[in-house]
Swiss-Prot record:
Binds polysaccharides in a Ca(2+)-independent manner with a preferentially binding to fucoidan, beta-glucans and galactans. Glycans are attached at residue 144. Gene3D superfamilies: CAP, Laminin, Mannose-Binding Protein A, subunit A. This is C-type lectin domain family 18 member A. The gene is CLEC18A.
């Protein structure tokens, strides 16, 4: 919670003054106040920016956290209204109360204090401090206290702000009027009781579709709902171009990845380079990241043979891309399932394996297995690791369902080892495949 940068004595004095002068404008309408010339009353741009920033910072500091708190934007028209109301110096004007301002559904926070005692920033901070006396769970303020400044300040659906101040005279003393206007207004009542100003929950978890962005300043952890800067809520790095309609990054030469964040500088010694994955597809008989290693087929590691191809099921778990690299180091690829026959045999084998095979790495997250199929955003389709288009499919019911976020495919145990799209950082066991044409050219291993 923000506290004004004042001495303890001064802070206590401010609190006492607030209690004495009242916390609602209706309580401080002394008839002797007279309007003075507005020479120094209007806020300049710097003051407007500071007040707006403070409001948003305080709104993102509420406890419990707010799930639907909107970010406020400055409104010059509201600032003009606030300035005009401050110039009334507390005098009630029925025509304004019942006319245009009520039609606009504007909410008000207003304060009269001795001139020069506090800054506008300190006044707003003191409004927020009323929250110490407010119970969100009960939806009410402490007995004999008022929290209406606080509840309006943190009213979740208010999205526009404008403030003004004015110097008024009261006999020998000078009084300063501070006013902030909020739209849409808050502090609505049901059956005589003010409803809670916001919904409790994780920051930005209940933002509406029109404000689905989540604004976070650098110096705090809270979040405020805002109109998204782009509907994709993402940006492309390294001078990549974002296609707003497809939410895909078009990367410049030498970069790849969902956000063009991966620099591609590989040289494939015995193989071809796949720019979209920044990886090598090795020639027969070679493996490793750059296809520079001569490999030998490890016959003793074949778990099953299907139509001459060898399939090896790992006893360890890893992320998708690390699993793919481990298969390539051995001269193979992550399994490519291109027929119902291969799918049926693997599903049967893995089902039996669940109760018989030992796992040396107990840190795996699921009982699922990676295969060599990934979603390519640039092509808007799933492709095998070799770049081939996926013709045969065995996705489980309702899959794929991650819409570009689960880009890697696993055999899912809970779905009888049919396919599921999953986040590539998930740790699974995996299946390496050694094709028949590869095996025929490899020399015997040691």
């Amino acid at each position: 919670m923000l506290h004004p940068e004042t001495s303890p004595g001064r802070g206590h004095l401010l609190a006492v003054l607030l209690a004495l002068l009242g916390t609602a404008w209706a309580e401080v309408w002394p008839p002797q106040l007279q309007e003075q010339a507005p020479m120094a009353g209007a806020l300049n741009r710097k003051e407007s920016f500071l007040l707006l920033s403070l409001h948003n910072r305080l709104r993102s500091w509420v406890q419990p956290p707010a799930a639907d708190m909107r970010r406020l934007d400055w409104s010059d028209s509201l600032a003009q209204l606030a300035q005009a109301r401050a110039a009334l110096c507390g005098t009630p004007t029925p025509s304004l109360a019942s006319g245009l301002w009520r039609t606009l559904q504007v909410g008000w926070n207003m304060q009269l204090l001795p001139a020069g005692l506090v800054s506008f920033v300190e006044v707003v901070s003191l409004w927020f401090a009323e929250g110490q006396r407010y119970s969100h769970a009960a939806g009410e303020c402490a007995r004999n206290a008022t929290c209406t400044h606080y509840t309006q300040l943190v009213w979740a659906t208010s999205s526009q702000l404008g403030c003004g101040r004015h110097l008024c005279s009261a006999g020998q003393a000078a009084i300063e009027a501070f006013v902030c206007a909020y739209s849409p207004r808050g502090n609505w009542e049901v059956n005589g009781k003010t409803i809670v100003p916001y919904k409790k929950g994780a920051w930005c978890s209940l933002c509406t579709a029109s404000v689905s962005g989540c604004f976070k300043a650098w110096d705090h952890a809270g979040g405020l709902c805002e109109v998204p800067r782009n509907p994709c809520r993402m940006s492309c790095q390294n001078h990549g171009r974002l296609n707003i309609s497809t939410c895909h990054c078009h990367c410049p030469p030498g970069y790849t990845g969902r956000y063009c964040q991966v620099r591609c500088s590989l040289q494939c010694v015995h193989g071809r380079f796949r720019e979209e994955e920044c990886s090598c597809v090795c020639d027969i008989g070679y493996g490793g990241a750059q296809c520079a290693t001569k490999v030998h087929f490890p016959f003793h590691t074949c778990d099953l043979r299907i139509d001459g191809d060898c399939f090896m099921v790992s006893s360890e778990a890893d992320t998708y891309y690390r699993a793919r690299m481990k298969c390539q180091r051995k001269g193979g690829v992550l399994a490519q399932i291109k027929s119902q026959k291969v799918q049926d045999i693997l599903a049967f084998y893995l089902g039996r394996l669940e109760t018989t095979n030992e796992v040396i790495d107990s840190d795996f997250e699921t009982r699922n297995f990676w295969i060599g199929l990934t979603y390519k955003t640039a092509k808007d389709s799933f492709r095998w690791a070799t770049g081939e288009h996926q013709a045969f499919t065995s996705f489980a019911f309702g899959q794929p369902d991650n819409h570009g976020f689960g880009n890697c495919v696993e055999l899912q145990a809970s779905a009888a080892f049919n396919w599921n799209d999953q986040r590539c950082k998930t740790r699974n066991r995996y299946i390496c495949q050694f094709a028949q044409e590869h095996i025929s050219r490899w020399g015997p291993g040691s």
